[in-house]
Amino acid sequence: MSSAAMSKYVNDMWPGSPQEKASPSTSGSGRSSRLSSRSRSRSSSRSSRRDSRSSSRSSSRSHSRPRRSRRSRSRSRRRHQRKYRRYSRSYSRSRSRSRSHRYHRDSRYERPRRYYKSPSPYRSRSRSRSRGRSQHRWSYYAITRGRRYYGFGRTVYPEDRPRWRERSRTRSRSRSRTPFRLSEKDRMELLEIAKANAAKALGTANFDLPASLRAKEASQGTAVSSSGPKVEHSEKQTEDATKNTSEKSSTQRNIAFSSNNSVAKPLQKTTKAAVEEKSSGSPKIDKKKSPYGLWIPV
C-alpha cells in the first residue's frame, strides 16, 4: 500500500482534515445522511415507546375505570343515605348491633364461666387482667356478695354465710374493748362454788371470808328477808284471782236465739227446769216457742 493511498484513507477518517475542507459538498452530504438515519431510528423508537405506553394505559384504564366508578358510586350512596338515615331505626340498629358484637367479642369484658378455685379469704383484690388472677378475682367478688356460680350455666346459688365472715365475727368478739361483766346472781353462785371447793380442800366448813365477800353476803341476806313477805303476798293474790275465775265459769248462763229478736239474750231458768235437766241429763226443747230450738253451750 502506497503512502499516498494511506494518507487519503487517514484524511477521509479524520474529521478535521484539509482535504475535507477542500471538498465540503461531499462531507456535508455524508453528515446529512448519517443524521437523518439517526433521527429516523430515534423517532421510530420514541413512537414505539409511546405506542406501548398508550396501549398499557388504555388497558389499565379499561380495567381500573369501572372499579373506581363503582367505589365512588358506593361511597356517594353511603354518604347520601347516612345524611337522611341518621335518625332512622335501621341505621341505629345496625350501629348498635355492631357495637354490641364488638363488646361481646372483646375478651376484657367477658367473665369466665368456670370457677375451679376460690381464693383465700385474706387475699387482696388484684386488678390485673391475666387469666389466672381474673378467675380468682371474679370468684372472690361472688363470695363477698354471698353467691357462687357453678358449672357451665349462669345459674346463681346463694349461700347463707361465707366462712371468712364467720371468722371475722369471732375475732371481733374476742377483741372487744368492753370488759365482760357478771351479774350479782352469777357472782353469788361462783362464791358458793368457791366455798364448797374450799371446804373439800381444807376439810372444815368453818373458815373466815374476806371483808368484801362478807359485805356481799350480808346484803344478799337482807334482800332475801325483804323479798320473803312480798312473795307470799303475790302468791295470795294469784290464788284469789284463780278462785274468782272458777266461780264465774260455774255461773255461766245459756244463750238462746228467738225469731223475734236477733240479739242473743240469756234465759232465766226456774228451779224446776234446772232440777229436771239435772235428773234427765239433757234439756227439754220446746219446738212451738222457737223454730231453731235451744242452743246448748259446748
Curated annotation (Swiss-Prot):
Organism: Mus musculus
GO cellular component, one term: nucleus
Function description: Probably acts as a spliceosomal factor that contributes to spliceosome assembly and regulates the isoform switching of proteins such as PARP6.
Record-stated family: Belongs to the RSRP family.
Location in or out of the cell: Nucleus
Any Pfam family the entry gives: RSRP
Protein name: Arginine/serine-rich protein 1
GO biological process: spliceosomal complex assembly
Record's compositionally biased regions (Basic residues): 60-105, 124-135
Key words, A-Z: Methylation, Nucleus, Phosphoprotein
Biased composition (Polar residues): 219-228, 247-271
Low complexity bias locations: 23-36
Residues annotated with Omega-N-methylarginine modification: R145
Sequence positions bearing Phosphoserine: S17, S118, S120, S282
Post-translation changes: Phosphorylated. Phosphorylation at Ser-118 and Ser-120 mediates the interaction with spliceosome proteins.
Principal location listed in the UniProt entry: nucleus
Domain of life from the UniProt record: Eukaryota
Positions with biased composition (Basic and acidic residues): 230-246, 274-289
Chain spans, region Disordered: 1-135, 161-181, 218-298
